[in-house]
Amino acid sequence: MTTTAAGLRRTFTHDHVVTAPPDALFPLLCPVLEYAWIPTWECTLVHSVSGVAEHGCVFTTDFGDGEETWVCTTYRPPTAIEYTRVATGGWVTMLALALAPTEAGTALTVAQTFTAVTPQGECAVAAMDETVERDVWTDLSRLASVYLATGAMGPA
């Protein structure tokens, strides 16, 4: 077995609220449907039998820090969806989204585990900012709430 100096792992977990029930929110957690409510969303769908998110769905993104290949590894409507993302920059992200009903709508728990697989990835993972990651998901929760309330995309 060969080992590497990489392997740094960091996990960030945040709780958010979306003002709609889980069965309304869950379908939006999809690479195709995110175009309707996330102003900056872009992806290339590689594989999906249904044309939307499903177990085994594969797509790619590139938001300026290198391409990532996403695979949907858990698909349990309307309570859980997980994606594993492999970044060309040398890290893997496990993204787990858990949805639970509340009086306000949906409690959304976002858990992101970043694991470096190269020395370059180790630098990237070490530099990741938990506050930035939380703020991204706070904004996404706001955008989902706006879309589900109005049917229109909110401002970025």
Region annotations inferred by a language model:
Residues 4-6, 50-51, 72-73, 98-100:
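Short secondary-structure boundary/capping segments
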